[in-house]
Amino acid sequence: MPEANGYYRLENSFHQAPPGAKKLGPADPNEVLPVTITVRRRPGSPSLPDQEHWASTPPGERQFLSSDEFEERYGADPGDLELVASFVRERGLTLVDTNPSQRTVVASGTVANLSKAFSVELGRYETDDIVEKPRRPIRVAEKAPGKQKKQGEAEKTVYVGFEGYVHIPERLANVVEGVFGLDRRRLARRAMVPFPTITPLTPPQVAKLYDFPATPPHMHKETIGLLEFSNPMFGTCGYYPGDVTSFFTTPLGIGPGYTAPGLTDIGVNGASNAPGGPDDIEVALDIQVAGAAAQGAHINVYFTTWDENGWILAVKRAVHPKPGERRPSVLSISWAWSEFDTIGGLTWTKAVMDAVSTTFQEAAMFGITVFAASGDYGSSAGIPGATAHVAYPESDPWVTSVGGTTIGNVSGSSFTEVTWVASGVEFGTTGGGVSDAFHLPFWQHHHNIPPSVNPGHHRGRGVPDIAGYASGYTIVYSGAQVPDVQGTSEAAPLYAGLIALINGHLGERVGYLNPTLYSHRLQHCFRDIADGRNNSDLGAPGYTSVPGWDACTGLGSVKGHALLKALEHHLLAVHAGHGEESFTGKVAGLVFDRFGEFEGFLLAEVHGGERKFDSREKEVQQVVGRAWSEHVTTTVTVRDKEAREPVSITLRDHS
């Protein structure tokens, strides 16, 4: 129903001030803000493929879309875009862009005009950021405006925002899904801390210990996307190209003998590559780790702002690039923010979370694998107190969450690996726990995800999914070495590099990864970490590292070559007999159900005279033994339509 002014309340747009925030007064009516308006898909569009679809369609058999195909099937109706554009112009706002694939209308306007257009009261709010500053590595990059705070002292942040709902006129009520940019509070914190007591390894050394596959030919076809964030009010972040060159080609980094990646800078929401701020170290770390793990791959660096509009526009830009831009095959995100400030106090509005999550779902349709660091604040996600939290976007089921480990006692290919846990305000702890925003996905049902440690002990998506080295790299920044840079943001770009390598070997994109990772047939691909450590942090109750999946290291660290082999189209010998008839051939792939149990053949090419045998000619009658995995023989019984009796087929790995 419309409200008194004839406007409709936009559901899921509710904002509340952060705990302890103080409203300083109205926002400057002449300040210009960017906004993004998202619209519905064109009427009659099919539903996006869901997780069950991708679980039943294994890598190698997935059909991805072109930009034109996606726009035609799932894009916005041009009439809807024009309707919103007309509203923008009528209200004295400036129309910046419309994009049918992203389903967005981007505009800008003064605070006065925006307040009237969307029936909100924009104000200036002051809030504390009490955990970022102590965990920030104080390096040569520290040039933040204003007086520097002491360790442990609260840092005041002022932002433009509002409380309550966004409102839209009646004619847009069934067209507009969200309006973003009217609230500019912070929604991104980098996952990176100093830890000066560990002798760091290099990214190539870690890749070797994790048995990453060799660099295949044609890696120039692979593109890794990195999302980087800065303060929309005054902050900047970026990298110096000379630092990247030095890291790969000189003893300051891992050189000589390595090649610096090709880089493309893509600015979003007014941000750009502008080094000189406190977050430069994160940008340098992401580029140098991803580039070292996947030599020859191109890297897109997406610079954006750390508010809701910056998140939405950056993720949409990566998934739906402009003409001439490379679409990444892998996306790595080393930034996050707690789902909730307190229980019931949603930090991300549902509209923002839905918009970002839907775009990650769209990424699967282009074969994009998305990784996100689980954060460096243990079970607290950076929120002090007696309540556990997890961060977003790592809690999104369309994202592979990456926790942290520590590697020691290295001797050749042998090493010890434990949960990355430390104590004290200057150190870090691998993030992980149970989501408050997302239900337990079906692909985690058989992995003993514990209930939340919070009162009520609800069930939800467990994070992280996997874990990797977080115990310190030496990187190059501003022409000098910066040692001991640690955090789960080391692990996310490392695994982005691994998937780029695997894509290069396969000659096709792996795409959405989570249901595949949790398949029983892939469990030999992980190094389980069960050291009994707990990720409690900042007063929040924690979770313990135990055998199997846990909320510290997920399934464990990844054995790169084993994962490649598991994702390949396995060349399997097939031996079958029925009466006097026998034949031998190859199976290109196997079908597993959502719980990892063998269901049948994806494709089979069987040789023996002129005999052909494929998945359409038989149906599985019985499964004998467990699902196929490396070094395991599985016998299944199938029925040939031409045979009166079942045919027994034994599969053995001969790859």
Language-model-derived ranges and their functions:
Residues 2-98, 106, 111-402, 435-487, ...:
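Substrate-binding/charge-relay-adjacent region of secreted/lumenal peptidase catalytic domains
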Residues 397, 401-436:
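Polar, glycine-rich mid-to-C-terminal structural blocks
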Residues 406, 451-454, 502-551:
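An often Trp-containing, charged/polar helix-loop segment at the C-terminal end
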Residues 549-572:
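A recurrent domain-boundary module in secreted/ectodomain proteins
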Residues 595-615:
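OB-fold (S1/OB) nucleic-acid-binding surfaces
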Residues 619-635:
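Short nucleic-acid-contacting surface segments enriched for D/E, G, S/T with interspersed K/R
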Residues 640-655:
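OB-fold/S1-family single-stranded nucleic acid-binding modules
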